[in-house]
Amino acid sequence: MPVAVMAESAFSFKKLLDQCENQELEAPGGIATPPVYGQLLALYLLHNDMNNARYLWKRIPPAIKSANSELGGIWSVGQRIWQRDFPGIYTTINAHQWSETVQPIMEALRDATRRRAFALVSQAYTSIVADDFAAFVGLPVEEAVKGILEQGWQADSTTRMVLPRKPVAGALDVSFNKFIPLSEPAPVPPIPNEQQLARLTDYVAFLEN
């Protein structure tokens, strides 16, 4: 059975996810093709469905995993997501040459991760070092600062600090493109540089529990 055609919208990604799940269920002997496994695993990561991603990885036959290195590459991204290693997510995505059926999904995953990181920083901090913020959103410092200025945040070129604007009701949810009411968080004082990324990782864990 041919691999489903890729599309860019979130609706099309959900439709593609359903198609890939059906292809796996209908596959002879319950064993799908490597492209189907690759798309399905990447789509689970895109939708932050880590439970299904883990179960899929466990049931992919070892012979298929060993013969198709892209599957291991996709799962390595999943491991970074599981560890809440935001800089590692971008690095791992960028380190691979993805197939044409997987690349659009990984690009969407990178963009979704970046939006999530922006939302987390806006909730967790009153200020953060620009270099640490850039690592968390996976962008060069100059590009990251330009992006936050376009969002109405502030940046101090002298101290190299980014000053986030707190989210308002209906702000972007940290999970994936969902809008939910958010209460105004209490002010958070600046934290020493070496603790910033660890603090953000802890904040992700708090929000997801």
Swiss-Prot record:
Keywords linked to the UniProt accession: Cytoplasm, Nucleus, Phosphoprotein, Signalosome
Tagged with keyword Cytoplasm: yes
Where does the record place the PCI domain? 8-179
Q: Has the keyword Ribosomal protein been applied to this entry?
A: no
Record's superkingdom? Answer: Eukaryota
- List, alphabetically, the Gene3D superfamilies matched: 1.25.40.990
Q: Which GO terms describe its biological process?
A: COP9 signalosome assembly; negative regulation of cell population proliferation; protein deneddylation
Q: Name one GO cellular component term.
A: COP9 signalosome
Sections of the chain in a coiled coil: none
Residues modified as Phosphoserine are S175
- One Pfam family it belongs to: CSN8_PSD8_EIF3K
Compartments, as annotated in UniProt = Cytoplasm; Nucleus
Role description: Component of the COP9 signalosome complex (CSN), a complex involved in various cellular and developmental processes. The CSN complex is an essential regulator of the ubiquitin (Ubl) conjugation pathway by mediating the deneddylation of the cullin subunits of SCF-type E3 ligase complexes, leading to decrease the Ubl ligase activity of SCF-type complexes such as SCF, CSA or DDB2. The complex is also involved in phosphorylation of p53/TP53, c-jun/JUN, IkappaBalpha/NFKBIA, ITPK1 and IRF8/ICSBP, possibly via its association with CK2 and PKD kinases.
The record's family statement is: Belongs to the CSN8 family.
Assembly and oligomerization: Component of the CSN complex, composed of COPS1/GPS1, COPS2, COPS3, COPS4, COPS5, COPS6, COPS7 (COPS7A or COPS7B), COPS8 and COPS9. In the complex, it probably interacts directly with COPS3, COPS4 and COPS7 (COPS7A or COPS7B).
| Name of this chain's protein | COP9 signalosome complex subunit 8
Give the lineage. Eukaryota, Metazoa, Chordata, Craniata, Vertebrata
From the UniProt record, report the name of the gene that encodes this protein. Answer: COPS8
